[in-house]
Amino acid sequence: IELTVHDCEFGEAPRHIGLLHHLLYVGRIGRFEIRGSRLQGGFRGHLIKSRARLNHIHANFAVDDETGEASYELDLPNGGVAWVVGNVFGQAARTQNPALVAYGAEYDPHADSLLVMAHNTLVNRAASDQAEFVKVWRDRLPAAAEVILSNNLVFGPGRFDGSAWAGSI
C-alpha cells in the first residue's frame, strides 16, 4: 500500500487533554510520500507520524505556530528508509517534547533503516536545555541502521542525537 500527499494543508488539532491527535498519521504501509504540504497547530500529538517502510518527505512546511503544543514535528517510530529533504521544521515554545525529529523511538523496527536528512531548516523556539533537533534511538534500530545528516540549517538551542550542543544561532 502507498500513500501520496501533495500540496495539502493540515492544522489545528483538536485540543482534548489526554488524547494524542497527530495531524497526519501513516500506518505500517510500504511507501509514504508527502511533498509541498503545510502542517501547523498541533496539540500533544505529532505533526507527521509515519510507520511506512519507505518515506519521501520533501519541501514541506511543518512548523508549530505560537499556540501549538505538538510533540515531534516528524516522528518515524519504526525507522525504515526515510529521505527527508528541503523541509522547514519548527517547534513551538510550548512543545510537549524536546525533540523536533524522532527516528526509531518505538520497538519493532523495519529491517532496512536509513535516515537521510539534507537541506532542511530546523527551528527550535523552546527554551529547553534538553532540546534536540534530531533524536535517534539506536538501541531500538537494527545494528546496520544508518543516519546521514547533511547541510541542515538550525536556529535556536539544541543538539543532534545526544551529541554535544550544536549551539544557538
Functional labels for PLM-detected ranges:
Residues 1-169:
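Glycine- and acidic/polar-rich repeat regions and solenoidal domains
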